[in-house]
A protein has these predicted regions:
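Membrane transport/envelope proteins' first extracytoplasmic loop
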Residues: 1-300, 312-315, 331-332, 362, ...
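N-terminal Sec/SRP start-transfer signal
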Residues: 1-35, 330, 339, 427-467, ...
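Interfacial "coupling" helices/loops that link adjacent transmembrane helices in transporter permeases
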Residues: 18, 304-344, 707-749
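Short, strongly hydrophobic transmembrane alpha-helices
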Residues: 20-45, 343, 351, 456-481, ...
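Juxtamembrane segments of multi-pass membrane proteins
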Residues: 60-74, 440-571, 576-579, 588-591, ...
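Small-residue-rich transmembrane alpha-helices
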Residues: 300, 307-310, 319, 343-374, ...
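Short cytosolic juxtamembrane segments of multi-pass membrane proteins
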Residues: 411-427, 812-824
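C-terminal transmembrane helical bundles of large multi-pass transporters
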Residues: 530-531, 644-650, 660-768, 772-781, ...
Length: 824
């Protein structure tokens, strides 16, 4: 009995006898370990991909943006940059012209495409290869080509590059002809992105859908010709030497521009101010926190389940351990057999866990390559992450086996021979039920008494299932919350005018100008309201947020925002904020804050100004950037009687798309989009995110089923003598099965309750903390639908209640005399 061969043979005998249980527990453990290992690589993948992509295209360190509506002669910004004291810190610089436009094209299947876009006029340069990506365009914020080419010369028509996700979403395949606002056309010869367009920044900011907006990269001189602004720019991008003081250089730039170009308002920002840069890095970090929480919960559920089930399996062998002790065997030798079973489960769990982890890894790798908007995606295998998770998975079953073995070999033989609930000293919490009037007779009360008779076992089973149910609840709740947010935005923006369109003009116009009259008098327009849309900032104390100011028309407007508190702005110094904006700034109706905005100082010249304004009220749109002011407030910006946008309702016989196409060719129009475009873009992004959530929820449900099955199987082994006694006294199979179902049902209800409470808490953290850091502009509505609650009930209560049915075959084939025999 001392040789390893003996123990291996005995271990093999146990494996053949209990292989379904060992494999099932191993699979439970493998699910937790594999998911933790697979999800653990996401942050490193995304950060490495971000670093490589931004580095390959030489992202700017500083950017100088002229105030909206301001344009500077070509070379003026470069001259100012070269005149600063630290000019030698600048290693590369490039001027640009960036303006909104309308894209009209035809998809590969003949479908017309009309969406807003953005002309990005940049310097051209020779193509070069960086990390396997063909890079072209300017030396700063270069264009990385995914397909095609971009040759700015030797072609009769202006050549352009479109965003690849936009082209894929709309079926545009280069070479293709695309028409821009004003009737000009360009030839799309390639698809690519630049650092500032990795995340689409359309009229809805980071919430613009990939297929609803695209930059159009063209040579700088072509952009000047297409937009009617010859020899003009409005943007400068610079790269500094490593280790340079960015803030000092930015201050020098502002002073020099103010000296050389008086009256010109500019904003100097750095890399961290790029919305796409912030989102990509913050999203990688916060998503990993979210995945770590879910992986931890699933791994915790697997750990609780494995610990409980292995412990109960070992304790089911206590009778055999007691017999061995009575025969004089040393406790340490009696411990070898159950520890070997723990080792078997550890090996099975790690092997299957690595397989599951690799499968999850491969799935996520493909998902990142398809959805990550980067020219370089690094998804190499993270062996360290796998080794760490595998080590955890290997230790869990060994520790789970060691605890009951230590307890088993420290008792007297007669105590070890006792089986079932009698091995629990004091009957657990069962005496408490003596003071609780339970309905029914002794048989009807047995399930409840069994649950409290061994509280440690019950708690472990409930916690294991509850932790995994919490993952399903919180993940499903995230989808519900996003959908509720989209629904609220759609309800707000489409009320009273479901077909409403928003027209962006290519510059500021007098409201009585022929250009505005041409748009409002078009046959495609039923009614229209002129308005002024200005980018600005609101500041209260140390808090500052970016907003989009919209003036409200007088009379009977096409659309007005809903007032959730206070009233619509009446005076020029009143603003109506989103509820989320008021919350972030810590203000309410009647309080004051500072408005930082551009103010016209002359044709094509704007300066930055500050105005104290009063909060007139709030509106319920979940996006925090829409801010509304009275029409008279245009004088605050130095633009009385001037407009640059219109809200309109299409003619009765026209659809929204038909009206877009009809308006796109009119002079002065930069873009036309549906009022619901923002919500539609968010819904499109939700579909991409939902695929990840659904897979994790499916894995969680499978793990709950495994926990329920294993718990039932162990219960059947542990209570075999009790069941045999019931059969000996004449109880039918259905009565014994009903007792098992009710007992599991009670634990399922407890697990579901814990899962719902924990899941709602996690959902609150995700919405109010995690998402708030990544997407502060979105006031996500916390929501948990009845469907998600039903899913939790099915995963918890349903799985636990139905699992005992799987033991019917074993109960029918039970040999009652052999089962009741104490010693063979």
């Amino acid at each position: 009995m001392r040789g390893p061969r003996f123990w291996l043979l005995w271990s093999w005998r146990d494996l053949r006898r209990r292989w379904p249980l060992i494999v099932a527990i191993g699979l439970l453990l493998a699910g937790g370990v594999g998911l933790a290992a697979g999800l653990g690589s996401m942050r490193d993948w995304r950060v490495d991909s971000n670093d490589a992509s931004f580095g390959a295209l030489n992202v700017h360190d500083l950017r100088v943006q002229a105030e909206q509506g301001s344009f500077i002669p070509t070379g003026a910004l470069l001259d100012a940059a070269e005149a600063i004291p630290d000019a030698d810190e600048i290693t590369a610089a490039s001027e640009r012209l960036i303006l909104p436009t309308q894209i009209t094209a035809v998809s590969g299947d003949g479908r017309p495409v009309t969406t807003p876009g953005q002309i990005v006029g940049v310097e051209t340069g020779p193509a070069r290869s960086v990390d396997g990506v063909e890079v072209t365009g300017p030396p700063v914020d270069a264009v990385g080509l995914k397909s095609g080419e971009w040759q700015a010369t030797d072609r009769p028509r202006t050549t352009a590059v479109l965003d690849p996700q936009y082209a894929d979403g709309n079926g545009i395949v280069p070479p293709a002809r695309v028409e821009l606002a004003g009737g000009a056309s360009v030839e799309v010869t390639g698809l690519g992105t630049s650092p500032e367009t990795f995340v689409v920044q359309g009229p809805g900011g980071a919430f613009s859908g990939e297929s609803e907006f695209s930059p159009v990269f063209v040579p700088l001189h072509s952009a000047q010709r297409l937009t009617g602004r010859p020899d003009r720019v409005n943007d400068l991008a610079l790269v500094l030497r490593p280790g340079s003081d960015h803030a000092a250089v930015a201050r020098q730039l502002e002073r020099e521009i103010d000296r050389k170009l008086p009256g010109l308002g500019v904003t100097v920002t750095d890399t961290d101010d790029i919305d796409g840069y912030r989102i990509l890095y913050d999203d990688a970090e916060n998503d990993q926190q979210l995945f770590d929480v879910f992986a931890f919960l699933i791994l915790a559920g697997a750990t609780f389940g494995a610990f409980n089930l292995i412990s109960r399996t070992v304790e089911a062998q206590r009778r055999e351990i007691g017999v061995g002790m009575a025969l004089g065997l040393e406790p340490r030798r009696l411990a070898i057999r159950p520890m070997l079973m723990g080792l078997q489960i550890a090996v099975v769990g790690v092997l299957f866990g690595v397989v599951v982890g690799l499968a999850v890894n491969e799935w996520l790798r493909g998902l990142l390559i398809d959805q990550l908007p980067l020219p370089i995606v690094k998804t190499d295998l993270r062996s360290g992450t796998f080794a760490q998770r595998a080590a955890i998975g290997f230790l869990i079953p060994l520790l789970a086996a060691a605890w009951p073995v230590m307890r088993g070999v420290r008792v007297t033989p007669i105590e070890a021979i006792r089986s079932g609930f009698r091995s629990s000293r004091g009957g657990g919490l069962a005496p408490l039920l003596a003071h609780v009037p339970l309905p029914g007779g002794s048989l009807a009360q047995m399930p409840a008494r069994n649950v409290v008779r061994a509280p440690r076992r019950t708690a472990l089973t409930v916690l294991a299932s509850g932790a995994v149910v919490a993952v399903a609840v919180s993940m499903s709740g995230m989808l519900d919350s996003f959908q509720a947010t989209i629904d609220r935005n759609t309800e707000e923006t489409l009320k009273t005018a479901p077909e409403r369109l928003t027209v962006t003009l290519d510059r500021f116009y007098d409201e009585r100008s022929p250009t505005v009259a041409t748009v409002t008098g078009s046959d495609a327009v039923a009614t229209a309201d002129e308005k002024l849309v200005i980018p600005a900032k609101l500041r209260s104390g140390d808090e500052e947020i970016e907003v989009s100011l919209n003036t409200l028309p007088t009379g009977k407007p096409v659309w007005t925002p809903t007032v959730s508190s206070g009233h619509l702005p009446v005076r020029p110094d009143e603003v109506l904020l989103a509820e989320s904006a008021a919350s972030d700034l810590g203000v309410e109706a009647g309080q004051s804050l500072t408005l930082v905005h551009p103010r016209s100082t002359g044709p094509g010249r704007f300066e930055s100004a500050e105005t104290e304004v009063t909060v007139s009220g709030t509106h319920p749109d979940p996006f925090r950037f829409p801010v509304y002011m009275a029409s008279a407030s245009s004088s605050v910006f130095g633009l009385p009687g001037v407009v640059n946008s219109l809200d309109l309702v299409p003619a009765r016989d026209l659809t929204g798309d038909a009206a877009k196409r009809s308006l796109a060719g009119l002079p002065g129009i930069a873009s036309v989009e549906s009022a619901s475009a923002l919500g539609e873009s968010l819904e499109q992004g939700l579909e991409d995110f939902a695929s990840i959530i659904r897979v994790v929820v499916a894995i969680a449900v499978v793990l709950v089923l495994l926990i329920a099955f294993n718990s039932t199987a162990i219960n059947a082994d542990e209570r075999a003598r009790e069941h045999a006694t019931m059969f000996a006294y004449g109880l039918p199979l259905r009565s014994v099965l009903r007792l098992a179902v009710v007992e599991s049902l009670i634990m399922g209800v407890l697990a579901t309750a814990i899962g719902l409470i924990l899941g709602v808490a996690i959902l609150g953290w995700v919405v109010n903390v995690n998402l708030k850091e990544v997407l502060p502009e979105l006031g996500t509505v916390t929501s948990l639908s009845s469907g998600s609650i039903i899913l939790a009930a099915l995963a918890g209560v349903g799985a636990m209640a139905l699992a005992p049915v799987l033991t019917v075959r074993r109960l029918r084939r039970m040999d009652v005399p052999s089962t009741l025999r104490v010693v063979e």
